[in-house]
């Protein structure tokens, strides 16, 4: 829960006669994800649509501080049956473009710097998702954001862990490029009838063309509580 703890450990002597303790410590982590929305008035953003969790325990990771950097997608490991694909890229280490202040089960939230290259070319109203055709905006090559068609198969309001929509990728170009939904696409905005309705969050391991999404209402509510 982020609180300090004091523990007593009894060391064990190894074969060389040296006393040792076993310690499992994780002090940082990094990865590629997608910004879902940005408010130019407050310079705040929401991303991922789910929390950053420990890869070994699946627990939501507390953090003291976090930073965001620009990245470029260099390669894609395609998703397949039983195996999640991923976007692979390089970070721009010339400087941070923002800071994180919250890691929640509904996404990560932060602010961008004054000189951040992130721009708001259009303001899109928010709306509730409904079953039917939709599009997602994703960056799966270089730094270009493209629009791809998907189908919202089912809406599950209030479902836990960012699984409020069941999605099916229908765009042949995206399926050819990535196999469907891959790691790194989390946070990709879902638009329906020109309105922002949510973000991509998870992929089905049994079928990479299908996955889940969180509603934008749930994500915005989580951001307001941080």
Predicted regions and their residues:
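C-terminal recognition in membrane/secretory proteostasis and scaffolding
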Residues: 1-226
């Amino acid at each position: 829960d982020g609180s300090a703890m004091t523990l007593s450990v009894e060391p064990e002597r190894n074969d060389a006669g040296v006393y040792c303790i076993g310690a499992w410590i994780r002090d940082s982590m990094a990865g590629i994800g997608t910004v879902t929305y940005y408010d130019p008035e407050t310079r705040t953003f929401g991303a991922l649509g789910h929390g950053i969790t420990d890869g070994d325990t699946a627990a939501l990771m507390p953090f003291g501080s976090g930073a965001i950097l620009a990245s470029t997608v260099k390669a894609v490991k395609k998703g397949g049956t039983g195996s999640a694909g991923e976007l692979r890229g390089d970070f721009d280490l010339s400087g941070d473009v923002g800071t994180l202040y919250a890691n929640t089960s509904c996404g990560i939230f932060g602010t961008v710097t004054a000189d951040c290259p992130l721009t708001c070319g259009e303001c899109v109203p928010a709306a509730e998702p409904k079953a039917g055709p939709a599009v997602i905006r994703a960056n799966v090559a270089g730094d270009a954001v493209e629009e791809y068609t998907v189908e919202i198969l089912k809406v599950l309001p209030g479902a836990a862990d960012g699984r409020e929509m069941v999605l099916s990728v229908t765009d042949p170009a995206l399926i050819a490029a990535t196999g469907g939904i891959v790691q790194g696409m989390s946070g990709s905005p879902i638009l329906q009838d020109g309105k922002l309705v949510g973000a991509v969050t998870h992929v089905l391991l049994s079928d990479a063309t299908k996955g889940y999404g969180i509603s934008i209402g749930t994500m915005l509510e989580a951001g307001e509580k941080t």
